[in-house]
C-alpha cells in the first residue's frame, strides 16, 4: 500500500477499458465492401458451415463478419453495414452484418424475430 507522499508524487494509474470492436472506431455501425464471401467451420463441439464475409470498412480496417439468418444474397463488392457482436464458436469473428440494410437483403419468409433479420411484416391473410 503506497504512502500519501508516494501518491502525491505519482498518482494511481487509470484502468483503461479495451474495446471489443476496435474497427468500428466508437461508431454503432460502419459501412464496408465485401472482399470475400465464404463458409467456415466452427470450433468443437459444434459442426456446421457458417457463412462469413471479409469486409473492408470505411475506417480502413479489414474484418471478418458473420452473416446471420437462412440464405443471403451477398457476393464480392456488395456494400454492407457492419455492427459489433462476436460469434462464440468462430474464432476471429467479432462483427455481424446487418440484414436488410444497404445491399444485404432481409431473410425471406421470416415470421419471428423479424427486426433482427430485416424481414417485413407479412400480409394479414398470407401467413396461415
Swiss-Prot record:
It comes from the Bacteria. Pfam families: Ribosom_S12_S23 (PF00164). GO terms for cellular component: small ribosomal subunit. GO terms for molecular function: rRNA binding; structural constituent of ribosome; tRNA binding. The modification 3-methylthioaspartic acid is found at residue 89. Keywords: Methylation, Ribonucleoprotein, Ribosomal protein, RNA-binding, rRNA-binding, tRNA-binding. GO terms for biological process: translation. PROSITE patterns: RIBOSOMAL_S12. Coiled coil: none annotated. The keyword Ribonucleoprotein applies. The keyword Ribonucleoprotein applies. Belongs to the universal ribosomal protein uS12 family. HAMAP family: Ribosomal_uS12_B. Part of the 30S ribosomal subunit. Contacts proteins S8 and S17. May interact with IF1 in the 30S initiation complex. With S4 and S5 plays an important role in translational accuracy. This is Small ribosomal subunit protein uS12. It comes from Campylobacter jejuni subsp. jejuni serotype O:2 (strain ATCC 700819 / NCTC 11168). The gene is rpsL.
Amino acid at each position: 500500500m503506497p504512502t500519501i507522499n508516494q501518491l502525491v508524487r505519482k498518482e494511481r494509474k487509470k484502468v483503461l477499458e479495451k474495446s471489443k470492436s476496435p474497427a468500428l472506431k466508437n461508431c454503432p455501425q460502419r459501412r464496408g465492401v465485401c472482399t470475400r464471401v465464404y463458409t467456415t467451420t466452427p470450433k468443437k463441439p459444434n459442426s456446421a458451415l457458417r457463412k462469413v464475409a471479409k469486409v473492408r470498412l470505411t475506417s480502413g480496417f479489414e474484418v471478418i463478419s458473420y452473416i446471420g439468418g437462412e440464405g443471403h444474397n451477398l457476393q464480392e463488392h456488395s456494400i454492407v453495414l457492419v455492427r459489433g457482436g462476436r460469434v462464440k464458436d468462430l474464432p476471429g469473428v467479432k462483427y455481424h452484418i446487418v440484414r436488410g440494410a444497404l445491399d444485404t437483403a432481409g431473410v425471406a419468409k421470416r415470421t419471428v424475430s423479424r427486426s433482427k433479420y430485416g424481414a417485413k411484416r407479412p400480409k394479414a391473410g398470407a401467413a396461415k
